[in-house]
C-alpha cells in the first residue's frame, strides 16, 4: 500500500511562477524515497505541500495529494492536526532553529507529545528519554535539561528527529536534514534514520542535493529539475541505468574519490 | 618565475580567542605549513577545526597570537621578541594585492547597490591607477576571462545567480594576477554542476598564471580531484599532511580514515555498514592534554591521553601526528 501518493501535482506561487509542474509519484509503505535536484528545482516546495505547509503565497493549482486514502486538500483543520505528528512528521534543514531558544529541550519535547497523545508529563518525559537514547545521544539527561544553544548542530538535528519519530508516524518527511552538518555527523544521522526505518517501518521521503546520501538511503530516487520530475525509479535503475540526460549529468558532476568504483 | 617556489610560510602559528571568565579558546594550535607557487594546498576538517581562522590569519584579517607568517621570507604577521608585528600601510596594501580571497557565500560579498561593472573596475582604479575608461575596458576583459558576456557590466548583484556571482568574485580576485588565492569554502554554497564549472575555472587560470591556492573545504572527494597537497585538521591542530592523489589508499591517521569512511559515494553498496564516529569533539576551551582525537579514537591508549603526538614524516610529502603510525 502507498503511504503517500502525489497525482499530477502542480504548485503555483503568487508571482504566477509554477514551482512544481505535474508531478506524480507514490511512496510505498516502509520505503525510502529520495528527491534530488539542484536549488530552485521545487523539491522543497513539493515536500512542504505534502504536509500542507506551503510558504505564504504558495497554492496547490491542480492535482491531488493523498495520504493513505484521504485527500489532504479536503481535510479540516482538526483532521490535519491529527495527521501531522501522528500520521506524518517533518524535519527541517536547520532543525535547531525550530526549537524554542528560551525553553529547555524536555519542556518542548513533552509539550509536543502531549499535543497529540493523552499522557502525563512524567510519561512524556520517559518516552522522550527513551527515544533520545535510541538515537544514541550521549547522556540523555543532560540533553533533556539543556537549552538548544547548548547543543551542537548534530545533536539538535537528532533531537528534532527524535521528536518527529516518537509519535511513530507512518511517514517522515525530511527536508535536507543533513546538509548543514559535517560529514561524520551526517553519517550518524543517516545511519539512525535508516535504523528507524528498519525498526519501526516508517516510510521516509528525504529531500537532498547530495547524491551520495540519496544513493545510500533510498529505495526509490526522484530527480527534479525546474519543477519537473525528470526521472523516477528504483535506486539501481536511476544510479546505474539513468535514462534522462539531466540525471546522467548530475551523476557525472559529483566529485568522486579515487578507488571508489572498484570498492576500495 | 619558476614553479614550486615558496611564497607563504607559516611557522608554529597559533590563534587563541579570549572568552569571558578568563577562559581561552584555541582555534589554531601550532600550525606550520607552506604554500608554493602553482600548487593547490587543501585544508579539510569539520566545522570548528580552525580552518577558516587559519585563512583569515594568512590574509591578515585576524592577528596572529603566536608564531610567525612569512611572505617570501619576510615576516608579515606574528609574534617577534614578545611583540606582535603585522604589516601596515602601503606594505599591507601591496600584500593584499598579491593575496586574494574568495569567500563562501557570494551573495554576501557584493554590495547590493553597486553594479557588477563598478565592482570589477575597482582593482584597476585602486591599484593600477587606471582612468575610468581604461578600467572599463579591463572590466570587460575580466568578464570575458570567466566566460560572462559584456551585458553583465550593468547588472546588479540581485539579478544574478549564486554561480554567476561566484564567477565575478573570481574575476575580481584574479584581475591583478595575485600570487596566492585563498578559497574559503568557495563552492560549498553552490550546486554540484556549478561547483564543477567554478573548479574548472580556477584550474584553468591557475595553469595560466601559476598562482598558489589555499583551498578550504569539507568535501574530500572534491579536494582529491583538485589539489596536490592535503592538510587534515582537527580541533586546531594538523593531524595529517599528505599528497593529494589517492589519499583513500594512503591515509594513516585514524581521524582521516574516519572522515573518508563517512563519505557516501554514489556507487557504494547501500547495504555496507555505515562507519560512525562515536561521541563529540572535545571542547576547544581550556588546555587539551595529549592527542586531540583521543576521546573518539578506537586505538587510543594511555600514551594518547598523556602526550600530544607530533607530526612525523613517513614518506615524502606525508606527515602524520599519531603515536601508532
Predicted regions and their residues:
Chain A
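A short, proline-enriched helix->beta-strand linker immediately N-terminal to the Walker B motif
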Residues: 166-170
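The feature captures the beta-strand-to-loop junction immediately N-terminal to the Walker
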Residues: 36-38
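A short, surface-exposed alpha-helical micro-motif characterized by mixed small hydrophobic
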Residues: 214-216
Amino acid at each position: 500500500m502507498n503511504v503517500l501518493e502525489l497525482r499530477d501535482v502542480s504548485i503555483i506561487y503568487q508571482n504566477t511562477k509554477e514551482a512544481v509542474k505535474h508531478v506524480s509519484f507514490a511512496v510505498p509503505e516502509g520505503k525510502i524515497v529520495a528527491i534530488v535536484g539542484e536549488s530552485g528545482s521545487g523539491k522543497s516546495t513539493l515536500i512542504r505541500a505534502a504536509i500542507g505547509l506551503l510558504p505564504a503565497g504558495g497554492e496547490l493549482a491542480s492535482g491531488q495529494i493523498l495520504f493513505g486514502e484521504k485527500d489532504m486538500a479536503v481535510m479540516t483543520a482538526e483532521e490535519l492536526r491529527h495527521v501531522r505528528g501522528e500520521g506524518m512528521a517533518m524535519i527541517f534543514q536547520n532543525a535547531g532553529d525550530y526549537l524554542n531558544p528560551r525553553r529547555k529541550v524536555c519542556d518542548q519535547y513533552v509539550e509536543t507529545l502531549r499535543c497529540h497523545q493523552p499522557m502525563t508529563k512524567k510519561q512524556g518525559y520517559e518516552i522522550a528519554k527513551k527515544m533520545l537514547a535510541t538515537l544514541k545521544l550521549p547522556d540523555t539527561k543532560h540533553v533533556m535539561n539543556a537549552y538548544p544553544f547548548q547543543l551542537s548542530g548534530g545533536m539538535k538535528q537528532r533531537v528534532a528527529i527524535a521528536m518527529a519519530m516518537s509519535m511513530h508516524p507512518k511517514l517522515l518527511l525530511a527536508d535536507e536534514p543533513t546538509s548543514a552538518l559535517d560529514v561524520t555527523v551526517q553519517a550518524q544521522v543517516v545511519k539512525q534514520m535508516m535504523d528507524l526505518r528498519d525498526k519501526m517501518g516508517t516510510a521516509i521521503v528525504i529531500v537532498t542535493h547530495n547524491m551520495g546520501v540519496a544513493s545510500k538511503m533510498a529505495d526509490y530516487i526522484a530527480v527534479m529539475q525546474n519543477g519537473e520530475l525528470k526521472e523516477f525509479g528504483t535506486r539501481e535503475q536511476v544510479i546505474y541505468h539513468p535514462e534522462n540526460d539531466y540525471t546522467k549529468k548530475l551523476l557525472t558532476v559529483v566529485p568522486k574519490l579515487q578507488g571508489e568504483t572498484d570498492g576500495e | 618565475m619558476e614553479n614550486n617556489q615558496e611564497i607563504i610560510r607559516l611557522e608554529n602559528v597559533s590563534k587563541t580567542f579570549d572568552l569571558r571568565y578568563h577562559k581561552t579558546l584555541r582555534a589554531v594550535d601550532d600550525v606550520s605549513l607552506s604554500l608554493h607557487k602553482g600548487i593547490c594546498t587543501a585544508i579539510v576538517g569539520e566545522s570548528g577545526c580552525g580552518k577558516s581562522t587559519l585563512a583569515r590569519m594568512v590574509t591578515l584579517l585576524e592577528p596572529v597570537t603566536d608564531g610567525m607568517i612569512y611572505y617570501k621570507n619576510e615576516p608579515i604577521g606574528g609574534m617577534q621578541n614578545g611583540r606582535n608585528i603585522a604589516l601596515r600601510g602601503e606594505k599591507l596594501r601591496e600584500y593584499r594585492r598579491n593575496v586574494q580571497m574568495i569567500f563562501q557565500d557570494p551573495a554576501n560579498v557584493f554590495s547590493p547597490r553597486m553594479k557588477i561593472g563598478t565592482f570589477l573596475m575597482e582593482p584597476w582604479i585602486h591599484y593600477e591607477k587606471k582612468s575610468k575608461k581604461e578600467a572599463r575596458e579591463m572590466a570587460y576583459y575580466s568578464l570575458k576571462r570567466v566566460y560572462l558576456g559584456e551585458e553583465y557590466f550593468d547588472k546588479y548583484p540581485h539579478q544574478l545567480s549564486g554561480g554567476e556571482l561566484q564567477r565575478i568574485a573570481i574575476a575580481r580576485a584574479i584581475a591583478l594576477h595575485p600570487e596566492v588565492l585563498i578559497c574559503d569554502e568557495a563552492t560549498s554554497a553552490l550546486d554540484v554542476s556549478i561547483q564543477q564549472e567554478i573548479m574548472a575555472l580556477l584550474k584553468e587560470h591557475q595553469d595560466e598564471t601559476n598562482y598558489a591556492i589555499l583551498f578550504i573545504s569539507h568535501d574530500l572527494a572534491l579536494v582529491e580531484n583538485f589539489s596536490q597537497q592535503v592538510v587534515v585538521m582537527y580541533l586546531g591542530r594538523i593531524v595529517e599532511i599528505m599528497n593529494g592523489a589517492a589519499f583513500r589508499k594512503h591515509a594513516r591517521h585514524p581521524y582521516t580514515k574516519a572522515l573518508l569512511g563517512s563519505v557516501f559515494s554514489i556507487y557504494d553498496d547501500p547495504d555496507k555498514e555505515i562507519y560512525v564516529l562515536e561521541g563529540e569533539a572535545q571542547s576547544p576551551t581550556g588546555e587539551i592534554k595529549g592527542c586531540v582525537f583521543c576521546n573518539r579514537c578506537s586505538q587510543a591508549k594511555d600514551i594518547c591521553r598523556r602526550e600530544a603526538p607530533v607530526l612525523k614524516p613517513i614518506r615524502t610529502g606525508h606527515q602524520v601526528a599519531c603515536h601508532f603510525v
